[in-house]
Amino acid sequence: MYHVIAATTNPAKINAITLAFDDVYGPGQYRIEGVNVDSGVPLQPIGSTETRIGARQRVKNARQVRPKADFWVGIEAGIEDNMTFAWMVIEHLQARGESRSASLMLPDIILQGIRQGRELGDEMAVLSGISNVKQQGGAIGIFTQGKLTRTSVYHQALLLALVPFHNEIYQRPSPSKPAI
């Protein structure tokens, strides 16, 4: 049985991790433990690079907190231009898989608050009247009227981040390049 460390205690993120590991390894083949670790980036990361660093840092910190595990999973949501998205980082032994989620264009009323230093989740709570939005369906759930959720979008990206660990082509050595 695999021991999976989720570098989060957010239920929406843990549900996405559960769905992805169910799909790839099967229900009952792993156990997930959520740990609260720092991302090392601002609460609302701006740009793909900063967001990816946050996901990688979560994995690094989770490995320090729980070094005896099989997988470590970090998810960090961010904003780039007028889009929200997230980076998924999964490490297993000495290998890493990464994927970026689908993006959602945000309305100007939300972006204005973000430019003033507020988090997307806080802006969504004010505008929707739903507290703790980011631990539920997220902005994605509100804007798609539940057709997609934070969990469903992260689930898809996590499946992609898991590919290097179960697809045998990733395990093959690279052929050496011919001399020029």
Swiss-Prot record:
Domain of life: Bacteria
Reaction catalysed by this enzyme: XTP + H2O = XDP + phosphate + H(+); ITP + H2O = IDP + phosphate + H(+)
Annotated keywords: Hydrolase, Magnesium, Manganese, Metal-binding, Nucleotide metabolism, Nucleotide-binding
Keyword NADP belongs to the record: no
Cofactor(s) essential for the protein: Mg(2+); Mn(2+)
Annotated EC: 3.6.1.73
Gene3D superfamilies: 3.90.950.10
Pfam families: NTPase_I-T
Residue numbers binding Mg(2+): 38
Subunit structure: Homodimer.
Function text: Phosphatase that hydrolyzes non-canonical purine nucleotides such as XTP and ITP to their respective diphosphate derivatives. Probably excludes non-canonical purines from DNA/RNA precursor pool, thus preventing their incorporation into DNA/RNA and avoiding chromosomal lesions.
Family annotation (PANTHER family): NON-CANONICAL PURINE NTP PHOSPHATASE_PRRC1 DOMAIN-CONTAINING PROTEIN, PTHR34699
Protein's name according to its UniProt entry: Inosine/xanthosine triphosphatase
Organism, scientific name: Yersinia pseudotuberculosis serotype O:1b (strain IP 31758)
